Swiss-Prot record:
Annotated Gene Ontology cellular component terms: cytoplasm
EC class of the enzyme, as a word: ligase
GO molecular function: ATP binding; serine-tRNA ligase activity
InterPro entries per the UniProt record, alphabetical: aa-tRNA-synt_IIb, aa-tRNA-synth_II, aa-tRNA-synth_II/BPL/LPL, Ser-tRNA-ligase_type_1, Ser-tRNA-synth_1_N, SerRS_1_N_sf, SerRS_core, tRNA-bd_arm
Description of its domains: Consists of two distinct domains, a catalytic core and a N-terminal extension that is involved in tRNA binding.
Keyword Zinc on entry: no
Gene name of the record: serS
Organism: Pseudomonas paraeruginosa (strain DSM 24068 / PA7)
Protein's UniProt name: Serine--tRNA ligase
Higher taxonomy: Bacteria, Pseudomonadati, Pseudomonadota, Gammaproteobacteria, Pseudomonadales
Major subcellular location class: cytoplasm
Catalytic activity entry: tRNA(Ser) + L-serine + ATP = L-seryl-tRNA(Ser) + AMP + diphosphate + H(+); tRNA(Sec) + L-serine + ATP = L-seryl-tRNA(Sec) + AMP + diphosphate + H(+)
Known pathway: Aminoacyl-tRNA biosynthesis; selenocysteinyl-tRNA(Sec) biosynthesis; L-seryl-tRNA(Sec) from L-serine and tRNA(Sec): step 1/1
HAMAP family: Ser_tRNA_synth_type1
Binding annotation for ATP: 264-266, 351-354
EC numbers on record: 6.1.1.11
Amino acid sequence: MLDPKLVRTQPQEVAARLATRGFQLDVARIEALEEQRKSVQTRTEQLQAERNARSKAIGQAKQRGEDIAPLLADVDRMGSELEEGKRQLDAIQGELDSMLLGIPNLPHESVPVGADEDANVEVRRWGMPKTFDFEVKDHVALGERHGWLDFETAAKLSGARFALMRGPIARLHRALAQFMINLHTAEHGYEEAYTPYLVQAPALQGTGQLPKFEEDLFKIGRDGEADLYLIPTAEVSLTNIVSGQILDARQLPLKFVAHTPCFRSEAGASGRDTRGMIRQHQFDKVEMVQIVDPATSYEALEGLTANAERVLQLLELPYRVLALCTGDMGFGATKTYDLEVWVPSQDKYREISSCSNCGDFQARRMQARYRNPETGKPELVHTLNGSGLAVGRTLVAVLENYQQADGSIRVPDVLKPYMGGIEVIG
């Protein structure tokens, strides 16, 4: 959530920055609400001053033995008007809060301006895509060859956009997740967490998925109890660990990592990536979250991105890093880098990680703060998140980049310890 004071006092400036994201701020309505708020607040303050004066006059009139009934009537009337003023202020604030929940974050000044993914800027590349001397198969053909990837049975069980993995491919999928978690905890300083896969609405509001993106979520209604939602990413549960807290500055940065399934309805993805494991309703992901001092958050974003890149480097998978433009960033991000891995069957790079600095946007929603050691006052932390990595898409990249002419798959060196020393599957 944006700073309400900033939106109220500088709506034109905020609108101009949001316009670079393709978001149209209703400036007229915000200015009208601000005028109403000022008017009601001024009147309320005047009434309170008058009521205080009347109350003081009642005591003085009593001492003089005068009739205080008119003064009491004034005090009662003003009390009713003050209650009405409070109701009006609450209604104005409620409408503003509702508007704020639907407004995306402001892009950082370093973010390239553009309308869509075509304006994203390539920052760097690592590795060279392999040249094959045989016809490249996609991961579906490679996995179905021995029945180790079974989309037909998955569809029978659950419908479209699900996968059933068996045998060596299931083991390879598990090996990837274990490798990622071990790397991030042992070398990158993250604390591993096991989180709930079901969360309540306030957690999703805290990280920005609600109320705007409810159609993307799987919701579980419960009679007489709060609804639960399947997490679309462990970002939700990890970031909300600090919800409502005031942290000691010495605790920062906090760095969490978790391997979880993720659940998404893919409501806006009809017709896209219908074949294979690229876009599914259920997929595993290793998620990294950092809670940091605001002064260090953009430096932390570079480090977070490097942590995700390290996974791809050790797997020797070619990739590139993109700085997302204003029009392609996620709702809560102020700056984002996407990592795209080379997928030979598609002859292009595909997203495998998104690393974002959300500034104080999520922290304000969650009321996650730290105590500034210089002022002693609570201030909002900054939050960051990134995939380290999406396990299913990493599996796709390994299957396709490590395929051999006979359809077998070489096991990447860093995964061999997790595969019992197996060097080739298939």
